[in-house]
């Protein structure tokens, strides 16, 4: 029977084979016509790669079927070693949320009067509710970066 082999270049080769022929036998016939060694050939039929020891009838290849010839790729990339670090990773700073943190800015005395413990930023860009941080010799606004020296 006659089968067709389509190469990568689009060229179609006709081969005269029997259904009892092995895939090895077909590859050697392709080598005779094209000069490609059998170990570099991969034959594909109906989306499946054909194994060397099997016959054409195992894959239900009939007369005038078309096989696709693909060349085998060489090797693959080396597997990289995992990097071993000498120092441990730096632990990221975790933002701790304090419940009712606003209460640290005010003090309520026995008579119910509310006293502000921290100073509000006087800059017009900050607005109400922006408090200045107390340092040992100054007060600092974290929003507008205003610094006031303490006397």
Curated annotation (Swiss-Prot):
Family assignment from sequence similarity: In the C-terminal section; belongs to the eukaryotic ribosomal protein eS31 family. In the N-terminal section; belongs to the ubiquitin family.
Other comments on record: Ubiquitin is encoded by several different genes. UBI3 is a polyprotein with one copy of ubiquitin fused to ribosomal protein eS31. UBI4 is a polyprotein containing 3 exact head to tail repeats of ubiquitin.
Locations listed in the record: Cytoplasm
Signal peptide extent: none
Any one Gene Ontology molecular-function term assigned to this protein's record: ubiquitin protein ligase binding
Any one cellular-component term (Gene Ontology): extracellular region
Binding-site list for Zn(2+): 121, 126, 141, 144
Domain of life where this protein originates: Eukaryota
Placement of covalent cross-link Glycyl lysine isopeptide (Gly-Lys) (interchain with K-? in acceptor proteins): 76
Cofactors, names only: Zn(2+)
SUPFAM superfamilies hit by this protein: Ubiquitin-like (SSF54236), Zn-binding ribosomal proteins (SSF57829)
Record GO biological process: modification-dependent protein catabolic process; protein ubiquitination; ribosome biogenesis; translation
Protein name: Ubiquitin-ribosomal protein eS31 fusion protein
Keywords of the record: Cytoplasm, Isopeptide bond, Ribonucleoprotein, Ribosomal protein, Zinc
Residue ranges occupied by any Ubiquitin-like domain in the UniProt entry: 1-76
Listed transmembrane segments: none
Organism: Candida albicans (strain SC5314 / ATCC MYA-2876) (Yeast)
UniProt main location, coarse: cytoplasm
Keyword Ribonucleoprotein attributed: yes
Cysteine pairs bridged by disulfides in the record: none
Classification via CDD domains: Ubl_ubiquitin (cd01803)
One of the Pfam families matching this protein, by short name: Ribosomal_S27
């Amino acid at each position: 029977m006659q089968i067709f082999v389509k190469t990568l270049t689009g060229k179609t080769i006709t081969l005269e084979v029997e259904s009892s022929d092995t895939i090895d036998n077909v590859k050697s016939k392709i080598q005779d016509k094209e000069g490609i060694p059998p170990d570099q050939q991969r034959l594909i039929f109906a989306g499946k790669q054909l194994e060397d020891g099997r016959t054409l009838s195992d894959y239900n290849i009939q007369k005038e079927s078309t096989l696709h010839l693909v060349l085998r790729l060489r090797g693959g990339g080396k597997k990289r070693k995992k990097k071993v670090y000498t120092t441990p990773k730096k632990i990221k700073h975790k933002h701790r949320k304090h419940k009712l943190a606003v209460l640290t800015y005010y003090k309520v005395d026995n008579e119910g009067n509310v006293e502000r413990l921290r100073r509000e930023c006087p800059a017009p860009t900050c607005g109400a509710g922006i408090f200045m941080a107390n340092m040992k010799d100054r007060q600092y606004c974290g929003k507008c970066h205003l610094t006031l020296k303490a006397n």
